């Protein structure tokens, strides 16, 4: 983001290419806790659908995070290229995201910022697997109750906006929003004005508009409806979502 840049580097011995996130310490001032949190989370996890941290090192001016190189670009870019996904392709993407999120939740980690920009394709291939990135806002449950409002407006769950104590369910809400976008090309909640947007989200008011949703299966709509539940207790968890027929 604003205090880092990512470069491709090559291991001198093995010739393997990696991504190196170069963080300028001076620009990081006041945001150290965010970075420390991201590193702590990444060190704890190992899953094929999550970007992996290989090592860290620092100089007097910079900090370097060596990560697996993914070259397929953001899910967001492919959505913009395609307009929408077929149900088969969309369900394959969402299945991988859910597998990764289930793993995170089992590890006691809530991502809190799932969105198409943070979902990357491992390679440019059509059938490339998806990996989750950007753990800057993620939180380990052992760090105490979650009540901080954070995330990206269009993907935030109602309970987060109402400043209630919240948990893993916020990630499932975000998966619901992403699923919706994959199938029709636009978000379920939208307003130029953030206050109006938040009102829509808090009421969980959205439609499967005609004609955009006319050819989408009832199964897909049912899947999304179980994720975009206003009450987090009624919302699907990862296991339930993965068992859904869609």
Predicted segments, located by residue:
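Activation segment signature within eukaryotic-like protein kinase domains
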Residues: 93-94
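Conserved short submotifs of the Hanks-type protein kinase catalytic core
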Residues: 61-74, 78
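Conserved N-lobe beta3->alphaC-helix segment of eukaryotic protein kinase catalytic domains
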Residues: 22-45
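Activation-segment/catalytic-loop signature of the eukaryotic protein kinase fold
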Residues: 56
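A conserved short helix/loop substructure at the end of the activation segment
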Residues: 228-240
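Glycine-rich ATP phosphate-binding loop
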Residues: 5-26
């Amino acid at each position: 983001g604003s205090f880092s840049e990512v470069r491709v580097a090559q291991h001198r011995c093995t010739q393997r290419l990696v991504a190196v996130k170069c963080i300028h310490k001076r620009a990081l001032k006041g945001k150290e806790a965010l970075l420390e949190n991201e590193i702590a989370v990444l060190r704890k996890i190992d899953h094929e659908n999550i970007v992996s941290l290989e090592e860290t090192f620092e100089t007097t001016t910079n900090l370097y995070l060596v990560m697996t190189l993914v070259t397929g670009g953001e899910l967001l870019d492919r959505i913009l290229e395609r307009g929408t996904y077929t149900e088969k392709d969309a369900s394959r993407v969402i299945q991988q995201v859910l597998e990764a999120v289930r793993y995170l939740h089992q590890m006691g980690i809530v991502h809190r910022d799932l969105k198409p920009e943070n979902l990357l394709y491992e390679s440019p291939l059509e059938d490339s697997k998806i990996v989750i990135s950007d753990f800057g806002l993620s939180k380990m449950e052992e760090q105490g109750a979650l009540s901080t409002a954070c995330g990206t407006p269009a993907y935030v769950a109602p309970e987060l906006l109402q400043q209630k104590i919240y948990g893993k369910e916020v990630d499932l809400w975000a998966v619901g929003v992403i699923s919706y976008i994959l199938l029709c090309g636009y978000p379920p909640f939208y307003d130029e004005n953030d206050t109006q947007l938040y009102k829509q989200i808090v009421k969980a008011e959205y439609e499967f508009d005609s004609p955009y949703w006319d050819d989408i299966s009832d199964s897909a709509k049912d899947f999304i409806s179980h994720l975009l539940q206003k009450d987090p207790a009624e919302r699907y968890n990862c296991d339930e979502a993965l068992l859904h027929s869609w």
